[in-house]
Swiss-Prot record:
Protein name stated in the entry: Phospholipase A1 EG1, chloroplastic/mitochondrial
GO molecular function list: phospholipase A1 activity; phospholipase activity
Top-level EC class as recorded in UniProt: hydrolase
Record's function text: Phospholipase that releases free fatty acids from phospholipids. Catalyzes the initial step of jasmonate (JA) biosynthesis. Required for the biosynthesis of endogenous JA in seedling, inflorescence and spikelets. Not essential for JA biosynthesis after wounding. Mediates spikelet development and specification of empty-glume identity. Functions in a high temperature-dependent manner to maintain floral developmental robustness under heat stress conditions. Functions by safeguarding the expression of several floral identity genes, such as MADS1, MADS6 and G1.
Amino acid sequence: MTLPRQCAAACRTGGGGGGVVRCRAVAAAGGAVAVRDAVVAPVARRGAARKTAETVAGMWREVQGCGDWEGMLEPAPHPVLRGEVARYGELVGACYKAFDLDPASRRYLNCKYGRERMLEEVGMGGAGYEVTRYIYAAADVSVPTMEPSTSGRGRWIGYVAVSTDEMSRRLGRRDVLVSFRGTVTPAEWMANLMSSLEAARLDPCDPRPDVKVESGFLSLYTSADKTCRFGGAGSCREQLLREVSRLVAAYSGGGEDVSVTLAGHSMGSALALLSAYDLAELGLNRAAPVTVFSFGGPRVGNAAFKARCDELGVKALRVTNVHDPITKLPGVFLNEATAGVLRPWRHSCYTHVGVELPLDFFKVGDLASVHDLATYISLLRGADKKQPAAAAADAGGVLAKVMDFVGRRRGGGALPWHDAAMIQMGGLVQTLGLI
């Protein structure tokens, strides 16, 4: 029997009962012995065993990438995997629906709802997760506007949640979820537009100066705003490490199987990957596998960053639209495809991390939504051509508010170069559905 690569003994695809027989395949090479478990069903029970294996609970480790999704993406994504990835996309979409873009609101640029009822308020009360903490991020960049003091202020960037008991039974484990929204504020746009590489230095034992990431993403992840009024004191990194480590310790200490899933769209997928790398450097993935589901995500770091993520066992599934320009950035010219040719600059070449799940938005005839999260989800759900437009309409209110927000930030006494930059950003948002 062929097993997904790198699953090893940790990968379990079925329970111990129901007529399923475990066999142990022992492979020895150069004195090293690797023991792998395979699930073999008796002929008389083959149908029942297959039914068990093709549930989320029966194959959750494969869904989380224990075998690098080998055999699960071609010729078409496995239906269980496709459904799970779409579900995580919807949990990311909740961030957009809950984000407050009303300048008259006291929660302006923060979440509109308290964490106890946020998912219910955005129509996802049955998602099976309980939000345990909100996450805030502040970019350490200056944006000259009428309100320069707000450039580096912390903004609501997403949330941490944990699966309920009922959902955990369906999933086959306790799932700790971190969900990130994409780019909205001017400071975030400026952080996105920064293309220089900077040493991450997130390994507490070794600075690893060769492991570099995009400086804007690193700033969003590590900069702190101690004045944040909604409990976001400390950097995005500090908030996440405290909460995720607390949840993993609480549930794994109780004997449960636990997973850590980080999901994000656009800029949020970059933060998800940075967080996953950080958690793995600190060894948290020894207690719980760490997986990233990225939607329309840009490149984050260089080849050394990718190599270190691979070495640490960080699993990342990149859901991309083959026509989405954001997934080609940064590193339009200096990337994994040109590193071999541009050897003197190979350490400055951006490199994608993980396995790609490509989608083709042209097939739905909706060319204006090349970066739209709703269209990503519709294609994953196997929707027909009429549904992506309807799904995108659900996010239309958010897009309109973003455009209104961008327009207001252009007005007044903004500097000319900033005004031009905001016009370009607004055009990109309107054209590509960047929210």
